[in-house]
């Protein structure tokens, strides 16, 4: 899938190409795992084409490696779509409110991700109940909007109702998964590939130099 495009904004050397190819292989393995998880939780999942709530309000943390791969996707977009993305970045930047600023992803065009195959880890894992290394659970915000897990989500307690799970006859219990990038980076196949993730920033921070 990797297509190297020369541009004024980024130059890719042999080592970077190797890293990006390894990252692409990593994504194939990761997707296999995530797809199985979504399949296990399919009774509670409402994700479908045209559903873009997760792309409409977020901060989108990206490692440097993830961003470089995303940038390849951007470089291969038709010129008219590139212009729309750049306009989105400029518009979001004008609205920027500092740390913890929630915004629409600039790559969301007409309700669809314009760089879907190149999207980051946060985009691939959203929609599931997650658990960090300290055991803290996070239920996807779309549960409050009548989507994933909403059938068994108690808005008053902000928790999953085991009573509703049983009462409604679900076959499996909702499960939480540690899908943080920090955890994913430690998976055996990730370590074996020797990926250099680089620093982590919010997506908007990575993108701003390209409109200056």
Where are these regions (language model features)?
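Short loop/turn segments that flank or connect secondary-structure elements
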Residues: 1-53, 57-58, 62-212
């Amino acid at each position: 899938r990797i297509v190297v495009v020369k541009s004024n904004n980024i130059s890719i050397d042999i080592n970077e190409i190797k890293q990006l190819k390894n990252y692409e292989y990593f994504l194939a393995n990761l997707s296999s795992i995530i797809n199985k998880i979504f399949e296990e939780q399919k009774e509670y999942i409402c994700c479908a084409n045209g559903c873009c709530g997760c792309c409409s309000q977020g901060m989108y943390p990206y490692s440097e490696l993830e961003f470089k791969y995303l940038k390849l996707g951007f470089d291969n977009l038709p010129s008219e779509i590139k212009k729309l993305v750049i306009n989105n970045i400029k518009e979001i930047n004008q609205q920027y409110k500092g740390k913890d600023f929630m915004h629409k992803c600039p790559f969301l065009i007409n309700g669809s991700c314009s760089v879907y195959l190149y999207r980051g880890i946060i985009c691939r894992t959203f929609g599931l109940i997650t658990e960090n290394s300290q055991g803290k659970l996070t239920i996807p915000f779309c549960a409050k909007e009548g989507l994933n897990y909403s059938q068994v989500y108690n808005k008053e307690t902000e928790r999953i109702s085991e009573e509703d799970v049983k009462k409604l006859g679900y076959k499996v219990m909702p499960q939480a998964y540690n899908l943080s990038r920090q955890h994913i980076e430690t998976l055996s196949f990730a370590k074996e590939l020797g990926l250099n993730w680089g620093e982590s920033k919010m997506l908007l921070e990575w993108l701003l130099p390209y409109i200056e």
